[in-house]
Amino acid sequence: MLMTGIAMFGVLDANSKILSAEYSAAQAIFLRHVTLLALLLGLRALWREAGGSLRTRHPFLHGLRAVAMLFSGLLFFLAFRHLPLALGYLVFFTAPFLTLVMAALFLREEVPRAAWIWSGVGFGGVIIALVPQIGGGASLLGLGYALLGTICYATNITINRGLRAEAGLARLIFWPSLLGLIAMAPFAWGAWVPPDAEGWARLTANGVIAGAATLLLALAFRHASPARLAPFEFIALPWSVVLDYVVFGNTPGLAVILGGCVVVLACLMSERAVIAAARRPSRQGTSSGKA
């Protein structure tokens, strides 16, 4: 689920980069939330209570999550207006490390030592790829947008984990969509550009893809800890390079390729180490039982 969600977010960001050349961030994000809300309410009109209840015992967390989602989408839309897709994602790849820190600080989750080590290795891969880009004159404004968007994204993922005890997924779409629609409406109105047929299709697709990707990531982080899943978010690096080349014709430099290899290695080794750590206590318990 995590891998599919990340792939869909890559497609979403590629589509957003195309849209950013013609439409304001406010208009694109507004229509994204309109689409999400319309799909959810339409589904619930056909199947009552589809996705579970909209009520929650944690209104503050849902409100904070909605704000984090809104600013994450808005900031990344602005970032990709100034940056190549792969470069924006290089900044995004600090999210797994931030997620581990937030899970440890706010959720009091025990993070295995192996997860810290291999996420650190993955973060090092990001640095390898990013430093030459900064020295090459990359937009600092775009990088700033991407960094702030990454912090918002990590906050969203951490809150998803904190809300894992709540059954149903409808509220995960409803409240952020409602807030986004209300918050962006006046800004979208002031900067409205009438879309053509292709524009409507792309703007609507943004909402559909965003909703599907959000649900997949929420499900993934409800069924596994950030410590285990966070390193696998780094797989978005090679995926963004592929999209950047296929859609925009941008060829990655040697530093990006090298950094990407380090990141993928960190993903694989982290999973191997976490599985080994999870099995070790059970083996010790079995040995003690036999004794």
Question: Locations of the language-model features?
Answer:
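Loop-to-transmembrane-helix transition segments
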Residues: M1-T4, A50-L75, L141-G149, P194-A212, ...
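C-terminal-most transmembrane helix of multi-pass membrane proteins
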Residues: V131, P238-A291
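Alpha-helical transmembrane segments of compact multi-pass small-molecule transporters, enriched
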Residues: T35-L39, V91-L105, G120, L178-A183, ...
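Loop-to-transmembrane alpha-helix entry segments
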Residues: Y89-F92, R108-I128, S139-G142, D196-A197, ...
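Transmembrane alpha-helices of multi-pass small-molecule transport proteins
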Residues: E22-F71, C152-N156, W175-G190, L265
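Transmembrane alpha-helical segments that form core, pore/gating elements
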Residues: K17, A25-A26, L40, G135-P195, ...
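Membrane-interface helix-cap regions at the ends of transmembrane helices
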Residues: L37-R57, G124-G136, L179-A201, A205, ...
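Helix-helix packing/entry segments at the starts of transmembrane helices
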Residues: Y89-T94, L163-L179, T214-Y245
